[in-house]
Amino acid sequence: SKEDLCFYMEKIKKISEEMVRDGMSHPTMFEIETALSFLYFLDKKVDVVLLETGMGGRLDATNVVKKPIAVIIASIGMDHMQFLGDTIEKIAAEKAGIIKEGCPVISYNNQESVNEVIKEKAKEMHCKVTFVNSEGIRVLSESLNGESFSYRSSDGRWYEKIEIPLLGRHQINNAALALEALNTIRNYYCISEFQTEDGLRKTIWRGRIEILEKD
């Protein structure tokens, strides 16, 4: 709410001013937003937080969680090269910087050189890594109303028909990644297949290939 936003911004403003007085740099806008979200989640006692990095991973403001339930790495491309590196492998190494000791890693099935970087980091941190089974995706339908697909997960679990209202083949790949992540999270939370399928069916991403109006 607007009241919550003002309350936490006042707290962070006070701390930011103290940091500057002590000779430290003023937090960036993203660092402020990250701190605000952590304070809010703590006070509201949320059950689960799906935390997205701002850029990269290793040096990202969000990369302070010591023991996440799982680490999820999505598709890796040539983004933010001036900060993350000039090759896909260097960028992958920065992204893999969110991998924590002993935490399960679930990753999009990127090109082999990228997968190798992720596997190497996971091995170093004693983590089990699971990749999306790209061969297990079968597109059933694609339209302006959304997509449907079947999926055989990496552990053999069969999803006969998953429906998502999001547009684009990449969203099918993202949904498969979400399914793999949920398979891991089931070790901690009771999540039924109905809840999984219903959640994906109701997923909304405002402003991302969103149809605003139809004739």
Predicted feature descriptions by range:
Residues 19-21, 44-52, 68-161, 175, ...:
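Acidic, Mg2+-coordinating active-site environments of NTP-dependent enzymes
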